[in-house]
Swiss-Prot record:
Residues 447-583 form the SEFIR domain. This is Interleukin-17 receptor E. InterPro entries: IL-17_rcpt-like, IL-17_rcpt_C/E_N, SEFIR_dom. It comes from Rattus norvegicus. The lineage of its organism: Eukaryota, Metazoa, Chordata, Craniata, Vertebrata. One of its GO terms (biological process) is inflammatory response. Its main location: membrane. Residues 1-24 form the signal peptide. GO terms for cellular component: plasma membrane. Glycans are attached at N278, N307. Forms heterodimers with IL17RE; the heterodimer binds IL17C. Residues 437-637 are cytoplasmic. Keywords: Cell membrane, Glycoprotein, Inflammatory response, Membrane, Receptor, Signal, Transmembrane, Transmembrane helix. The chain crosses the membrane at residues 416-436.
Amino acid sequence: MGSPRLAALLLSQPLLFICLAVSAQVACPCLPRWTSHCLLAFRVDKHFAGLQCGWFPLLVRKSKSSHEFEVCWRHWTPSPFQRKLLGSPSLSQESHRISTHFLAISHRGLRTKRTQPSAAEGIEHLPGAGSQKHGGPEFSFDLLPEVQAIRVTIPPGPEANVRLCYQWALECEDMSSPFDTQKIVSGGHTVDLPYEFLLPCMCIEASYLQEDTVRHKKCPFRSWPEAYGSDFWKSIRFTDYSQHSQMVMALTLRCPLKLEASLCWRQDPVTPCKILPNATAKESEGWYILENVDLHPQLCFKFSFENSSHVECPHQSGSLPSWTVSMDTQAQQLILHFSTRTYATFSAAWSNPGLGLDSSMTPVYSISQTQGSVPVTLNLIIPFLRQGSCILVWRSDVQFAWKHLLCPDVSHRHLGLLILALLGLTTLLGVVLVLFCRRLLPGPGRTRPVLLLHAADSEAQRRLVGALAELLRTALGGGRDVIVDLWEGTHVARIGPLPWLWAARERVAREQGTVLLLWSCAGPSTACSGDPQTASLRTLSCAAPRQLLLAYFSRLCAKGDIPGPLRALPRYRLLRDLPRLLRALDARPATLATSWSHLGAKECLKSRLELCHLLELEAAKDDYHGSTNSPCGFSCL
């Protein structure tokens, strides 16, 4: 056993087994899962007296550099050589040194893993090892959840390489791109390492830049509640493989954790998922399987770990359900129509609608489809119980099934007559309300008349009053009526002036119209006596249904000629204040714009204004000649 050649021969056998396992891609429980192939060669170096070294080059596919095992021993190595060399992590003699370099290639790519010398003798041969700690670089960190990053601080000293990884049994796997970067940090500086998900197995790893240095790793998030929140469940990929009566879901985890899964049912997306008794799924290498389940969108898996849980409904991918049910009523029977795409047995039983899904009553009616072609439609006829009852329908050939609660409505036969009666009543009520409102409440489209009061005692003044009335009717538009005695001479002569005036006043009050008083300086009158005139004017103001509007022609009456009792009324000088007067008479701008927009409407209004202007001049000449023979008095024009 002291021969170097014999030792090399014995050592080559386990190494050859390792490489053959790698080449054949055989999974070994004690080795990482490798995907590359290697070739093994052994060479014995005889140049050193008393010390024999052997190198085992490893030619790794898709790698630019070669890696090798280096084994050194002295000729006096105690027996058995194989046990002390391969079975013991540290040899009993300080003079024995084992330095190995090997590759561990995981499913995420190529990564070099190094073991360190077991004694201080090996550390002295490392470059720059005198300035490093044997335990790797120290560092501190801060979690920055708002930016999804971890800030790592390296104390003053040499540069260090830092990274984030997910700790598995044999290695700390890199994160997915673009979070798999490694950053070099100078001593006394900080660096932010972004992460995709905050998970309990996430670790922070730091190492110096020299070859074969120890990596210092911290995995502090196992006890952090934040690591089991929404990020934990977002990082898991759920894949549904459910079919027939088997509920299957495969999980792809980023952490080596074992979750618990139970069957639950959820009434709607906002209510909690209620766990069913004795419905725990079996787990096998990330696959969760539950047998004898009716695949329904409201039957879900509830995964839990520690104090965190997540509900995943595997059959909500948009595919059609395996079976559906509809119902129809005929005479005293209820007919259930089952459409199924698989062999199944369906049952139904009457239930009280107030007791929910657990209140089925006997008897139970069933129908099966166990042979023949599918899909198929099955009809189950059930005697009608009573009005207001509901029926439970479920798949009875499985252990876990969702129950449908159907409540037949037999009132649809009278629904047409009821709707027709309601429509007739609604229409009648609407007509009555419209008529009532049109009678009592004047709408915005109803016309309001204008009562024009005057005291024209000459032919020129009467022509001027008629022209003013025609001008107001044309300018107001919208069918507005102007009431003046000159246009109703026959009616005034038949009933008399005073009855006509009171009838016109009542109409204006009923239709919420306006009284316009036209004032001018007339010939001799008893109005100059003072008190009788004041009393008559006050009586006229009180008798008006609304506040009086006073208008006067500037050539027939001056502002100071208006009596004192009437000076408190709104006054309008014609024809200068005609726009203000029209607004006071509730002339709508939309009506004016519509009427004036017709062809010739502006020309008609212009001709009315010119006629009023000419008649005003003619009446002023007549008043001037009459005033030379008698004093001036006040009167209505």
